[in-house]
Amino acid sequence: MTRDNAREIAVRLAYELSFTDKPVGELLDGRLTKEAFASLAEEDPLYADAPGAKQSEYIRRVVEGVSAHAAELDADIERYAVGWKFSRIPLTASAVMRVAMYEVLYMPEIPNAAAVNSAVNIAKKYETPETVRFINGILGSFVRQETAPRS
């Protein structure tokens, strides 16, 4: 499984967190099994390969982090979505941005450009071109402001 596929699965799981009552650990335990991937692979090629240990660890780290920092990430999204209330942003778009912002803030081993570019590419699969531009603009502003040297 590629890092991009693992990231897209993390986005899907972050999206699922938006409307499930399951604890994040329970959700991950149920979704990251070979059996779960095998059953989903019939309908979705993204699940053709179950994640190995490294990719499974990455997915868990991201999804658990997004869950733990959801309020902070949502506040960042709303702060950079000038003129938009968070509640108006599509759930898929917010999941994409949460994952990218979590990577930028808490995973220094991932280059910011890789996090943003991958997020935009994932968004292109699920959102309209206008929403993709919106996501790209928010993430670009976020990275410039949040990673700028502080004086």
Task: Locate predicted features.
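N-terminal interaction/assembly modules
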Residues: 1-132, 136-151
